[in-house]
């Protein structure tokens, strides 16, 4: 193990993300992009194994906006999809643009309705809090005539 601040595995719920071989790079990108985010542990292979060698990074523990995550370098077997995404609530247009541009500008791709994917294929929803507040409030209820 190269680095260990503390482990996320003490949390009751940790998001586990599968990467081909770039879990450490992705974790460092997330830690550098979002506040309250950091890499907390990097675990290396103790010896050679099928498809890898001693010292290869196997897992990386990190947080994204305080949410504990672990990235696994599991090879190309599984890919990320829109079935899972991080939804990031933003408080200003500047914050929305900053996160969007960081993700898309680092090899990611744009999608519709505030969705984008990072260069590792993980989906993100960069959502202005004003939008989610308005959706939660709903439209005014129509008045219904009372019945006798």
Regions found by a protein language model. Give the residues of each.
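Core segments of cupin and vicinal oxygen chelate
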Residues: 17-66
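Short loop/turn microsegments at loop-to-beta-strand junctions
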Residues: 14, 57, 111-113
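Short, Lys/Arg-enriched N-terminal segments with co-localized hydrophobic residues
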Residues: 1-8
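Short aromatic/hydrophobic contact patches that present stacked aromatics
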Residues: 14-16, 59, 85-87
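Residues that flank catalytic or metal-binding motifs in active/ligand-binding sites
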Residues: 11, 56-58, 82
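Vicinal oxygen chelate
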Residues: 19, 23, 33, 64-68, ...
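Gly/Ser-enriched beta-turn/beta-hairpin loop segments
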Residues: 53, 77-78
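A short, polar/charged loop-to-alpha-helix boundary motif
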Residues: 130-147
